[in-house]
Curated annotation (Swiss-Prot):
Keywords: Adaptive immunity, Calcium, Calcium channel, Calcium transport, Calmodulin-binding, Cell membrane, Disease variant, Glycoprotein, Immunity, Ion channel, Ion transport, Membrane, Phosphoprotein, Transmembrane, Transmembrane helix, Transport, Ubl conjugation. The modification Phosphoserine is found at residue 298. This is Calcium release-activated calcium channel protein 1. Residues 1-87, 141-173, 256-301 are cytoplasmic. PANTHER family: CALCIUM RELEASE-ACTIVATED CALCIUM CHANNEL PROTEIN 1. It is a multi-pass membrane protein. GO terms for biological process: adaptive immune response; calcineurin-NFAT signaling cascade; calcium ion import; calcium ion transmembrane transport; ligand-gated ion channel signaling pathway; mammary gland epithelium development; phospholipase C-activating G protein-coupled receptor signaling pathway; positive regulation of adenylate cyclase activity. The modification Phosphothreonine is found at residue 295. Oxidation at Cys-195 leads to inactivation of channel activity. CRAC channels are regulated by fast Ca(2+)-dependent inactivation (FCDI), a mechanism that limits Ca(2+) influx and cell toxicity. Contrary to ORAI2 and ORAI3 subunits, ORAI1 displays small FCDI. Both CRAC and ARC channels are inhibited by lanthanides including La(3+) and Gd(3+) ions. Residues 39-59 are annotated as: AKAP5 association region. Residues 3-47 are annotated as: Required for generation of inwardly rectifying CRAC currents. It comes from Homo sapiens (Human). Residues 106-119, 195-234 are extracellular. Pfam families: Orai-1.
């Protein structure tokens, strides 16, 4: 006897899915596509294997490259600063020395007035020293500036080594100090002395007619003794009163500016020393990398 074949499934009755069958496999495939199939708390994939000596060598090369670029940038910054100082010194010195020479030549001395000997000596000495200081600063600027200009116009980073600004640093600072500090103080003193020389002979009082003949000596002495301060003396005293506070303000500002500049340079030096210390530490680690062998990727721990 042959067994009876099984009846075909009816279309009216839906086929039930097997327990844990295709539904489970489909959910697994969907989780695998979305990336959520991994259990929570799984460690991330390990980084690429980089040995500690290789990492130190890479850091060393980066620091060396940055150090070289920073040194070139520092040299170019010093070159541009030196050029700016020389240009400012040359312009200031030419202007102030020319004014002092014109003032000394164009001043009209009254032959009938008895000038104090100290006033004339101070005016002559101040004018001479003022012109000498500014001409010295102008000479330094004229001699050094063309060499710096020739290097700064070359579009090459290594051409900064051909500039004499590093070797002539003291001369550049001296010219800048003579032109902007000492020369300006002497110019303020020159203005005060020029006011005294120019206005001191004026003795005519307001509302009085100009005398047609020279009065006798006794009358002139009596007039001077009874009149008090003349208009010329008042003008000279007024100019001195105005100029002295400005001179003190100029000195205070110069000292404050110098202290601020020195403080800024000191901070920059400390920063460069810290960078050099970091560079020395990396160099020491690179030199002794064979003394402490480490496994790959251990520096990431």
């Amino acid at each position: 006897m042959h067994p009876e074949p099984a009846p075909p499934p009816s279309r009216s009755s839906p086929e039930l899915p097997p327990s844990g069958g295709s539904t489970t496999s489909g959910s697994r495939r969907s989780r695998r596509r979305s990336g959520d199939g991994e259990p929570p708390g799984a460690p991330p994939p390990p980084p690429s294997a980089v040995t500690y000596p290789d990492w130190i060598g890479q850091s060393y090369s980066e620091v060396m490259s940055l150090n070289e670029h920073s040194m070139q940038a520092l040299s170019w910054r010093k070159l541009y600063l030196s050029r700016a100082k020389l240009k400012a010194s040359s312009r200031t010195s030419a202007l102030l020395s020319g004014f002092a020479m014109v003032a000394m030549v164009e001043v009209q001395l009254d032959a009938d007035h008895d000038y104090p000997p100290g006033l004339l000596i101070a005016f002559s000495a101040c004018t001479t020293v003022l012109v000498a200081v500014h001409l010295f600063a102008l000479m330094i600027s004229t001699c050094i500036l063309p060499n710096i200009e020739a290097v700064s116009n070359v579009h090459n980073l290594n051409s900064v080594k051909e500039s004499p600004h590093e070797r002539m640093h003291r001369h550049i600072e001296l010219a800048w100090a003579f032109s902007t500090v000492i020369g300006t103080l002497l110019f303020l003193a020159e203005v005060v002395l020029l006011c005294w020389v120019k206005f001191l002979p004026l003795k005519k009082q307001p509302g009085q007619p100009r005398p047609t003949s020279k009065p006798p000596a006794s009358g002139a002495a009596a007039n001077v003794s009874t009149s008090g301060i003349t208009p010329g003396q008042a003008a000279a005293i007024a100019s001195t009163t105005i100029m002295v506070p400005f001179g003190l303000i100029f000195i205070v500002f110069a000292v404050h500016f110098y202290r601020s500049l020195v403080s800024h340079k000191t901070d920059r030096q400390f920063q460069e020393l810290n960078e050099l210390a970091e560079f020395a530490r990396l160099q020491d680690q690179l030199d002794h990398r064979g003394d402490h062998p480490l496994t790959p990727g251990s520096h990431y721990a």
